[in-house]
Amino acid sequence: MLDICLEKRVGTTLAAPKCNSSTVRFQGLAEGTKGTMKMDMEDADMTLWTEAEFEEKCTYIVNDHPWDSGADGGTSVQAEASLPRNLLFKYATNSEEVIGVMSKEYIPKGTRFGPLIGEIYTNDTVPKNANRKYFWRIYSRGELHHFIDGFNEEKSNWMRYVNPAHSPREQNLAACQNGMNIYFYTIKPIPANQELLVWYCRDFAERLHYPYPGELTMMNLTQTQSSLKQPSTEKNELCPKNVPKREYSVKEILKLDSNPSKGKDLYRSNISPLTSEKDLDDFRRRGSPEMPFYPRVVYPIRAPLPEDFLKASLAYGIERPTYITRSPIPSSTTPSPSARSSPDQSLKSSSPHSSPGNTVSPVGPGSQEHRDSYAYLNASYGTEGLGSYPGYAPLPHLPPAFIPSYNAHYPKFLLPPYGMNCNGLSAVSSMNGINNFGLFPRLCPVYSNLLGGGSLPHPMLNPTSLPSSLPSDGARRLLQPEHPREVLVPAPHSAFSFTGAAASMKDKACSPTSGSPTAGTAATAEHVVQPKATSAAMAAPSSDEAMNLIKNKRNMTGYKTLPYPLKKQNGKIKYECNVCAKTFGQLSNLKVHLRVHSGERPFKCQTCNKGFTQLAHLQKHYLVHTGEKPHECQVCHKRFSSTSNLKTHLRLHSGEKPYQCKVCPAKFTQFVHLKLHKRLHTRERPHKCSQCHKNYIHLCSLKVHLKGNCAAAPAPGLPLEDLTRINEEIEKFDISDNADRLEDVEDDISVISVVEKEILAVVRKEKEETGLKVSLQRNMGNGLLSSGCSLYESSDLPLMKLPPSNPLPLVPVKVKQETVEPMDP
């Protein structure tokens, strides 16, 4: 019996368990039903099951171990304490670091673990610097609903430690979404002391646009093994019976070109420029465990995104799915949690700060052994076949043993109709500082030297086989962008499409020297800048046979550094933001403005790590740390750190108020004051007290309210009458111009103390004056009050005093008071 608490069910009937701390008793079923169910489960290929079938047909349910944070004195975290009793952790050598999960005893097929526990984020609430290595996507009605983040060990369970499977042969768990939860199902019996390795089920992989290796490499294992035993003279020469079939690299295939009897057939069978459904079926049939299907390697078996969808998705804020995202295959040499990731590593989650997954390859890129074993990586098809398909990004830390060679088992749809010259690849590599084994993460090769030597690399191709839709007059025009990552030029007739390639490029943070707000954004065909001819192409007139892949549409105006085309107005380019429709006088200002929407702040302060969109703002910010105030007011001799602050200050002396409210006659010296004033009309009060119902326009008002003046938590000894009166004065102050001015004062503590003192002074003086009125009425009668004169002038009213650091002249306010009519005796 298993030393865990299990629930056993058949179909949709669930039998409640009877369990104690050490043993489990299963509710028995009829022997015939039990035998039939066991036979069906053993014979079933669960890699082909849908999520509904997993939920319906699972036999055993393993719950997490109950965990109480206070039971062990806080020595363990939830992720480790929730491990079921039939599992154990796998630790790194001489370390307490968990690097995997193993079975403690035999686990039958059809057992369910879960659900996965973690922090929940929507697409809008994901923290800016969140580590997405443990993100799992939850879908509802085909749309992304939220993420489950298992990064925090204190808020997740043991399932975060399960490593992804390297190949279908090693996979023993399938991840499924049932309802709004993630569960792991055993798809094969797991013996004791075997590591649990998970991959997506078929439905889950479909939603994520991942390949499901079970369909491609495990369906016809018997057929593959039998094909190895078929007698063939040529096969026996290349592959003896006791040796696995040899795999040809592209470099070896190209060398066979000189032998018509072999090379010609290989070209026809493996490197055809067209792809059909028959090719896809052949590929599925020829899959085998000897050549596992790894998600990090690009297999472009899906159609590219339509061009209309691409155009719509280039606007900010519109999410588009990627075809294949980062996979969960860990590096074999780095078994730390940083090398593990949830299988959901989307390219959209890439940010300038999220680079933990980009580790160094375990095999040196310059080693002779690597070049000999994986020569196809330097061949004309190598990097193109692996890295240039739209939306795919093979990572550079993928172990070489997991990268299959190109041979007869990988048919023609994996290769474009013609390759990129090796010199072109070297040029791209040198420009980007990437070695030839880097596989260009999120970067497709640029066809810098499309025709080396002035001829096509394939003897089977001729000018008639090239598309006729593009003219040959631009054949020598080759793309040489400033930043090679910005433009893609894929082969036109293979599965590689220009629109899909453009869609695969993601925004990356630009360096301070680039000045581009969207560095890394691909230019679409509508606004690619017409390239200049290179010297190599000018010297090769016979290259007219090639096509101009980057033909510019002349009716559109735009720039490769912008993700959308620009319009013309009255014959001039209109630099308009496609998000907020704000226009600018020049392109550089528009680029800087786009960083506001993208959140990009490339200029960082080395002291406080604060980010800025412009270098000038960073330079002005440095004065905050140095305390330098080089600009002086000639009227009051007050000094300021920037000319803009001085200019705003001079408006106080001149009385200029350029910002006027459109609803009322109020005018202001600063735009921020007008913005705060508008909240009076819109009743927008963003600062809310968490203990009572009070809302305020200004943050300083809320802080004064929370300083012992909240009715839910009042200061000790404060009468209710005084508390009510103080809150009334806080609300009056909140809607005054003084609150707008104090909002800009840097010393927040002094502002709160000044406001609190003034409000208390008002309340105290009102109480004193009320007592004086009552005393005068009693002792002197009503004659004084009936005269209509006031006991105090407006000058006696307390005015809001600003701290010495920001003296602002205030206009005295005169309060008209009602006269008290004499009472009849």
Curated annotation (Swiss-Prot):
It is an enzyme of class 2 (transferase). Residues 527-574 are annotated as: Interaction with PIAS1. Its EC number is 2.1.1.-. Keywords: Adaptive immunity, Cytoplasm, DNA-binding, Immunity, Innate immunity, Isopeptide bond, Metal-binding, Methyltransferase, Nucleus, Repeat, Repressor, S-adenosyl-L-methionine, Transcription, Transcription regulation, Transferase, Ubl conjugation, Zinc, Zinc-finger. It is found in: Nucleus; Cytoplasm. There is a cross-link at K816 (Glycyl lysine isopeptide (Lys-Gly) (interchain with G-Cter in SUMO2)). Changing P84 to G/K: Protein instability caused by increased susceptibility to proteasomal degradation. Residues 84-201 form the SET domain. InterPro entries: PRDM1, PRDM1_PR-SET, SET_dom, SET_dom_sf, Zinc_finger, Znf_C2H2_sf, Znf_C2H2_type. SUPFAM superfamilies: beta-beta-alpha zinc fingers, SET domain. One of its GO terms (cellular component) is nucleolus. Residues 324-361 have a biased composition (Low complexity). The keyword Metal-binding applies. A zinc finger (C2H2-type) spans 575-597, 603-625, 631-653, 659-681. There is a cross-link at K816 (Glycyl lysine isopeptide (Lys-Gly) (interchain with G-Cter in SUMO1)). Belongs to the class V-like SAM-binding methyltransferase superfamily. PANTHER family: PR DOMAIN ZINC FINGER PROTEIN, PR DOMAIN ZINC FINGER PROTEIN 1. Interacts with PRMT5. Interacts with FBXO10. Interacts with FBXO11. Interacts with multiple nuclear sumoylation E3 ligases, including CBX4, PIAS1, PIAS2, PIAS3, PIAS4, PML and RNF4, but not RANBP2. Interacts with LDB1, SMARCD3 and SMARCC1. Interacts with EEIG1; following TNFSF11/RANKL stimulation in bone marrow-derived macrophages, the interaction promotes the binding of PRDM1/BLIMP1 to the gene promoter of IRF8. It is linked to In certain aggressive cases of activated B cell-like diffuse large B-cell lymphoma (ABC-DLBCL), PRDM1 protein instability has been observed. This instability, which impairs B-cell differentiation, is caused by N-terminal misfolding mutations, including those occurring at positions Pro-84 and Ile-107, and results in PRDM1 protein sequestration in the cytoplasm, followed by proteasomal degradation via a heat shock protein 70 HSPA1A-SYNV1/HRD1 pathway. These N-terminal mutations do not affect PRDM1 transcription regulation activity. This is PR domain zinc finger protein 1. It comes from Homo sapiens (Human). The lineage of its organism: Eukaryota, Metazoa, Chordata, Craniata, Vertebrata. The gene is PRDM1.
